């Protein structure tokens, strides 16, 4: 039974609710990015990555530019423990990368964690325990003070073990299930942990606030972060971090608003992989910054290759509409969208525009390793003349007159509608070729000869009904003479309204494409001709146009 009354708000507002953060317009500098793909992302996979796959994933994250990478919960499995030992023993961690390990606030797990990182040059030890009202009551059956003591005991042991190692250990604490925790209570636990660790500006601790399960709208989360930010002890010695999940679909907004409210670090995954609806997608966050003209400090200039590698390693398919990453995020099928994109691209080329500002495309696909020819405009029954003309021009160099573009669009859409599918670039050209280049249902031109005289004279050799016939005509020029010959023989009346031609290449051997439009009783009929000789191409175009008029009549 669909019953909304069984639910109620589970979040807690901070004691002093402020919205100072809304005065900050946008993210102008990149936060510290921490990838949690190898642990938080991996635990959500139906088939977790094996050791070799995790090593490949680690290398991918390093190449993208992550400087903090969560590696493992080393007490959770032998694979996670071995991953750490492999990275450390084989010196696979770059000097500018800090790895992170995660541990519950339980003694045997903490000790196992330090065994796993023995010999590492530097690492973040991430301590957490759940603090929400529901978990205190239902899971732990402990009071607030008892749950806080769990965190403090864990913090004491972490500090003791860190002092016994030669590694440079940084501390991180997370009040897990923060969205269901009283905000002032979460702050109290964080400050109690910091009192034990006593961080300094030169050796900061991290306080990480997770939306373990998203309960509120993002502006509420931002106000909670603002309260933590303003009241956190040792503030100049603490990096405030957020770890958003996406249960309400607001993970990206939670992260962006959280940073505006005072957070300096974001934990998440590529493509938002994670439990339930996933972690926040760090690609979306980074590219949102990039699209506003700010450097996200992560490199996604070959995002399609990254996506394919990620899919191979995780056996998870990235949704085709995933922001920035999906296969179809730059694709326009709509006719009006295609027309605007086509004109925008043409304007950009003609005016040598430096800043990116093409309708319907927020970032240049080329920046992400995509291309205009196959990724931007694709044709189905919803498409229009602009998109089809754009495809013919960018792939084949054919520049159709505006009205012919419209007619060609109708022909292509008709084929797509009848087959109930998208048309490939090659299929679109085939439609053009069939309807406007090789269209000779009534007659074909076999040959023509021009003769000198007061006016231009021509003899055409046609093939009609399997018979070869010769016809003559005169005119003020070559095209006019051929047109008059066809008019007289077929008893036609039409006006030659449009004649355009363009080269299909830049060298001397390039072919030309001629387009001709003739009108009869207000209706246009089109033909195209392609040949190395422009006269030949023009004659071919006129012959097709007359054939189409004959069919119409």
Swiss-Prot record:
Q: State the InterPro entries in the record.
A: 2-isopropylmalate_synth_dimer, AIPM/Hcit_synth_CS, Aldolase_TIM, IPM_Synthase, LeuA-like_post-cat, LeuA_allosteric_dom_sf, LeuA_N_DRE-TIM, PYR_CT
Cellular location(s): Cytoplasm
Region annotation Regulatory domain: where it falls in the sequence: 439-553
Name the positions where Mg(2+) binds: 40, 243, 245, 279
Instruction: Say yes or no: keyword Cytoplasm present.
Output: yes
Question: What does this chain do?
Answer: Catalyzes the condensation of the acetyl group of acetyl-CoA with 3-methyl-2-oxobutanoate (2-ketoisovalerate) to form 3-carboxy-3-hydroxy-4-methylpentanoate (2-isopropylmalate).
The broad enzyme category this protein falls into is transferase
Q: Which organism is it from?
A: Bacillus pumilus (strain SAFR-032)
Q: What is the name of the protein in this document?
A: 2-isopropylmalate synthase
For this chain's UniProt record, which GO biological process terms are given? L-leucine biosynthetic process
Provide the cofactor list for this protein: Mg(2+)
């Amino acid at each position: 039974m669909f019953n909304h009354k069984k639910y109620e708000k589970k979040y807690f507002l901070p004691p002093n609710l402020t919205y100072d953060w809304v005065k900050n317009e946008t993210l102008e500098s990149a936060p510290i990015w921490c990838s949690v793909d190898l642990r938080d992302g991996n635990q959500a996979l139906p088939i977790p990555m094996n050791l070799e796959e995790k090593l490949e994933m680690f290398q991918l994250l390093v190449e993208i530019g992550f400087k903090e990478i969560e590696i493992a919960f080393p007490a959770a499995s032998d694979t996670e423990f071995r991953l750490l030992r492999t990275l450390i023993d084989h010196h696979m961690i770059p000097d500018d990368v800090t790895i992170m390990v995660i541990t519950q606030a339980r003694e045997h797990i903490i000790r196992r964690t330090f065994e796993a990182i023995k010999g590492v040059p530097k690492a973040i030890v991430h301590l957490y325990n759940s603090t929400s009202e529901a978990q205190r009551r239902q899971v732990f059956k402990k009071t607030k003070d008892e749950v806080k003591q769990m965190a403090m005991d864990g913090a004491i042991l972490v500090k003791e073990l860190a002092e016994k190692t030669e590694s440079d250990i940084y501390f991180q604490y997370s009040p897990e299930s923060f969205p269901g925790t009283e905000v002032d209570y979460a702050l109290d636990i964080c400050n109690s942990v910091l009192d034990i660790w006593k961080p300094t500006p030169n050796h900061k601790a991290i306080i990480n606030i997770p939306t373990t399960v998203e309960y509120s709208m993002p502006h509420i989360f931002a106000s909670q972060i603002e309260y933590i930010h303003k009241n956190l002890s040792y503030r100049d010695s603490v990096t405030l971090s957020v770890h958003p999940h996406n249960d309400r679909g607001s993970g990206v907004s939670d992260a962006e608003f959280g940073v505006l409210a005072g957070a300096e670090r974001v934990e998440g995954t590529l493509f938002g992989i994670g439990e339930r609806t996933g972690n926040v997608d760090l690609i979306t966050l980074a590219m949102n910054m990039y699209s506003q003209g700010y450097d996200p400090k992560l490199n996604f200039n070959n995002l399609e290759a990254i996506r394919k590698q990620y899919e191979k390693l995780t056996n998870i398919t990235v949704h085709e509409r995933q922001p920035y990453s999906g296969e179809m995020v730059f694709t326009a099928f709509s006719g009006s969208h295609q027309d605007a994109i086509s004109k925008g691209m043409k304007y950009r080329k003609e005016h040598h525009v430096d800043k990116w500002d093409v309708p319907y495309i927020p970032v240049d696909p080329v920046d992400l390793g995509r291309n205009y020819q196959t990724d931007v405009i694709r044709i189905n029954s919803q498409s229009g003349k602009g998109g089809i003309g754009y495809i013919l021009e960018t792939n084949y160099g054919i520049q159709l007159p505006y009205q012919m573009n419209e007619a060609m669009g109708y022909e292509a859409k008709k084929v797509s509608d009848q087959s109930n599918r998208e048309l490939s670039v090659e299929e679109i050209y085939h439609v053009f070729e069939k309807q406007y280049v090789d269209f000779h249902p009534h007659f074909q031109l076999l040959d023509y000869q021009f003769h000198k005289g007061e006016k231009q004279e021509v003899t055409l050799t046609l093939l009609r009904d399997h018979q070869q016939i010769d016809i003559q005509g005169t005119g003020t020029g070559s095209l006019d003479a051929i047109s008059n010959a066809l008019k007289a023989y077929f008893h036609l009346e039409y006006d030659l309204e449009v004649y355009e031609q363009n080269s299909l290449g830049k060298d001397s051997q390039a072919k030309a494409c001629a387009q001709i439009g003739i009108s009869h009783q207000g209706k246009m009929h089109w033909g195209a001709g392609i040949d190395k000789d422009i006269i030949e191409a023009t004659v071919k175009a006129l012959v097709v146009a007359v054939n189409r008029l004959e069919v119409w009549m």
